[in-house]
């Protein structure tokens, strides 16, 4: 070996040793700072579970005259989806799009395929008015493909047992297991003649199907035993047509354990809805416009809802599944903050609700070992403030309400695996994840009036740099509307370089912190 080569290799090896020593020293400094500080975010980077790509899903339902959702999203001039609607939804980046809800009790899928001019109108019994069927299975699947979402359909589950829909003036609007199985064949059989005749030579590839929607709610639908038997009948019939499909059974209202015991082998997920996100106090300011005179009290009420209204239900469901030795994923296919007036309280257009929705999605992600499908809002419409996305009518802009803005931020900046938060400032609500050597922190500052500062440390790793993608507003009552559709656009900041990186989270802010790390040894 030549002397120059020898010196070069020795120098390189020495530099590597020095760099490694510096990394270990810096990791130790960061760990010591975390141990001595009451304001440290300390992460255990060991992967705990894989984060589902469907965790941030959305839910589309034709809502008749109540809120023209699907109809208002279709541009009849171009005979296509509205361009602004597609662009805003693509930016929202839902991993899954569900079509159904209460409308599935009288939805007849075959009426929505074939030439649009020949598709019949149908009455929307729950939400009023009539639907045109201009958006059927082909158009919905096309929409999902254009926005990058997996398709999920609710089948007509014999009208969920509600006999009203078997005897309407328009005839029997319920659907049986054969009808659902025929839908699976139409969608997924590569050689299906009817689908090909309707212009789709390739399968629609609908892999996810929900059996039952709010079947356990009220007294008009199936009782538990009948619902479970019907679930088995549907699952068998549908899987005879395509064994690769994923099926979601209804397990809310304490039904999950018995559903798993009797039908567990036939389904892949257990569905619940996180409804009932209602005020705890009868003297609430979260009713009508009362919050406007005392926004801080409204904030405090919102912060107090998540434990008793959402977390308790989730923990009870997880406990039930564990007792029945179930490995089925949880599918929270609907759920939103429910305030008077029904689904239209203006507070949901204001940043007062941003942190609330961030905490809800953080809760679901922290439970990502079991929660595989989830949302924090309805999806689209023109009037309901429980939506994630609003579109002007008859045309104009589409924009995201605070719930949608938060889901967009967290979905677009997230890791592949959940990791643990060992310590954090008490004012911050966190969910942490990891992809390779990058750590992602979803942070909601629960402090109404003050900023919260934090340092960062990762066990066994050195945090070398990072950035913050942040949504904040000086005005807690900042409202979004067609006049300011980008008011909640996230702002990006680099973390200031230092041995110990730190950030000051503004009051009421929602942020993602991305930490670039290196192994310390």
Question: In which residue ranges do the predicted regions lie?
Answer:
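Short Pro-Gly-centered flexible turn/kink motifs
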Residues: 503-515
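Carbohydrate-binding surface patches
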Residues: 427-462, 468-471, 511-514
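N-terminal export signals
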Residues: 5-27
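Noncatalytic carbohydrate-binding groove/subsite architecture in carbohydrate-active enzymes
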Residues: 224-354
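N-terminal catalytic cores of secreted or lumenal carbohydrate-active enzymes
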Residues: 35-284
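Aromatic/acidic polysaccharide-binding cleft in carbohydrate-active enzymes
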Residues: 331-408, 414, 418-430
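Acidic, Ser/Thr/Pro-rich beta/coil linker or hinge segments at domain junctions
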Residues: 461-505
């Amino acid at each position: 070996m030549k002397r120059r080569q020898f010196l070069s290799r020795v120098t390189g090896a020495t530099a590597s040793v020095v760099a490694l020593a510096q990394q270990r020293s810096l990791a130790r400094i960061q760990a010591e700072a975390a141990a001595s500080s009451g304001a440290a975010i300390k992460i255990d980077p060991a992967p705990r579970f894989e984060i589902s790509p469907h965790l941030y899903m959305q839910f589309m339902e034709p809502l008749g005259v109540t809120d023209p959702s699907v109809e208002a999203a279709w541009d009849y001039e171009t005979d296509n989806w509205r361009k602004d609607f597609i662009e805003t939804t693509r930016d929202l980046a839902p991993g899954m799009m569900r079509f159904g809800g209460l409308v599935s009790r009288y939805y007849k899928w075959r009426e929505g395929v074939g030439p649009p001019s020949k598709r019949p109108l149908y009455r929307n019994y729950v939400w009023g008015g009539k639907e045109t069927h201009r958006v059927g299975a082909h158009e919905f699947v096309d929409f999902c493909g254009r926005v990058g979402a997996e398709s999920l359909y609710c089948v007509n589950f014999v009208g969920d047992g509600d006999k009203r829909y078997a005897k309407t003036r328009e005839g029997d609007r319920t659907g049986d297991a054969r009808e659902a199985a025929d839908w699976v064949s139409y969608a997924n059989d590569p050689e299906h003649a009817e689908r090909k005749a309707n212009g789709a030579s390739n399968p629609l590839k609908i892999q996810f199907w929900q059996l039952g929607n709010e079947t356990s709610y009220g007294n008009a639908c199936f009782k538990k035993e009948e619902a479970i038997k019907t679930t088995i009948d549907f699952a068998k019939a549908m899987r005879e047509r395509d064994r690769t499909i994923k099926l979601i059974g209804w397990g809310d209202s304490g039904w999950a354990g018995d559903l798993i015991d009797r039908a567990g082998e036939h389904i892949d997920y257990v569905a619940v809805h996180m409804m009932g996100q209602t005020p705890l106090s009868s003297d609430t300011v979260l009713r009508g416009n009362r919050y406007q005179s005392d926004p801080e009290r409204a904030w405090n009420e919102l912060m107090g809802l998540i434990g008793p209204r959402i977390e308790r239900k989730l923990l009870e469901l997880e406990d039930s599944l564990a007792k029945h030795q179930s490995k089925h994923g949880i599918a929270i296919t609907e759920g939103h903050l429910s305030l008077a007036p029904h689904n239209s309280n203006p507070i949901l257009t204001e940043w007062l609700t941003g942190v609330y929705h961030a905490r809800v999605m953080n809760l679901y992600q922290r439970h990502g070992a079991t929660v595989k499908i989830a949302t924090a809002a309805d999806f689209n419409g023109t009037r309901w403030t429980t939506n994630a996305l609003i579109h002007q009518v008859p045309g104009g802009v589409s924009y995201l309400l605070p719930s949608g803005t938060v889901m967009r931020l967290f979905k677009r900046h997230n890791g592949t695996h959940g990791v643990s938060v060992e310590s954090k400032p008490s004012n911050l609500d966190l969910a942490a994840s990891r992809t390779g050597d990058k750590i992602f922190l979803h942070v909601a500052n629960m402090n109404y009036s003050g900023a919260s500062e934090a340092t960062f440390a990762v066990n066994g790793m050195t945090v070398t740099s990072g950035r913050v993608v942040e949504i904040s507003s000086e005005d807690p009552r900042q409202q979004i509307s067609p006049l300011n559709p980008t008011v909640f656009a996230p702002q990006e900041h680099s973390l200031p370089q230092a041995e110990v990186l730190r950030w000051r989270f503004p009051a009421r802010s929602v942020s993602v912190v991305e930490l670039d790390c290196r192994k310390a040894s």
